A protein has these predicted regions:
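Flexible, glycine-rich active-site loops centered on histidine and acidic residues
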Residues: 98-133
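Acidic, glycine-rich active-site loops and adjacent beta-strand->loop/helix elements
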Residues: 53-58, 85-90, 113-118, 144, ...
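Short acidic capping loops at alpha-helix termini that bridge into adjacent secondary structure
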Residues: 4-5, 43-49, 76-79, 107-108, ...
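Condensing-enzyme catalytic core mediating Claisen C-C bond formation in acyl metabolism
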Residues: 1-22, 123-186, 190-194
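Structural motif
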Residues: 51, 110-112, 139-141, 210
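Conserved catalytic cysteine-centered active-site region
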Residues: 4-27, 55-108
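Buried hydrophobic positions in well-ordered alpha/beta secondary-structure cores of metabolic enzymes
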Residues: 7, 29, 36, 47-50, ...
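Phosphate/pyrophosphate-binding loops at sites that engage ATP/ADP/AMP, CoA/4′-phosphopantetheine
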Residues: 32-48, 190-207
Length: 210
């Protein structure tokens, strides 16, 4: 009874993409990173660091970021690392990249968010599986002197044990979707207003909310 209409009505999601057997979070990250670098007009040597946010890396090591580094020919003497912060991973990635550039030098950072969550879900659990898909996005950032506001509210300590999620590969991801939805609807407007206050901007000046 989990029809397309059921999913769209309750989530607003109309389309999701899943990896083929030959694809992974790493291959998606490489494809997105190549496109971002090409569109930036920069050369691989211009990238000062590579940060990849993912919780579904195909390998314990090497990291997805290091696989991107090798595939794109980024300098080997520049930092490349993964971070795991789930939904907020890309935002953390921006902050980590800014810190790396400011500390170690460099002008440009490649930040990637990629997931292959279809490999980690139970297709019979519609409270979770209808919400997630597979994909990757990448952006090249330039270090600037303008203010950078990042508002975070950590709730990463809540754990729902479902037979062994703490042991990689032993159980699918399980989530209380309704509770997460209620939290997101309440938290997002508060975060937006906090960031606007910190950057002395108004809502009328915002073109996109992603």
């Amino acid at each position: 009874d989990t029809s397309d209409e059921w999913i769209t009505t309750r989530t607003g999601i109309r389309t999701r993409h899943w990896c083929t057997e030959a694809e992974s979070a790493a291959t998606l990250a490489i494809a997105a990173a190549k496109q971002a670098l090409q569109r930036s007009g920069l050369a691989p040597a211009d990238i000062g660091c590579c940060v990849c946010a993912t919780l579904s890396a195909p390998d314990a090591t090497p990291s997805v970021a290091c696989q991107v580094q090798a595939a794109l020919g980024l300098p080997e003497n520049r930092p490349a690392l993964d971070i795991n912060a789930a939904c907020s991973g890309f935002l953390y990635g921006m902050g980590v990249a800014r810190g790396l550039l400011a500390t170690l030098g460099g002008q440009y950072a490649l930040v990637i968010g990629c997931e292959a969550l279809s490999r980690l879900m139970d297709p019979a659990d519609r409270a979770t599986c209808v919400l997630f898909g597979d994909g990757a996005g990448a952006a090249v950032f330039r270090l600037a002197d303008t203010p950078f506001a990042l508002t975070l509210g950590a709730r990463g300590s809540d754990v729902l044990h479902a037979g062994g999620p703490s042991r990689a590969g032993s159980a699918p991801i399980t989530m209380d979707g309704k509770a997460v939805f209620r939290f997101a609807v309440d938290a997002l407007p508060k975060c937006l207003h906090t960031v606007l206050d910190e950057t002395q901007r108004t809502l009328d000046e915002v073109d996109w909310v992603i």
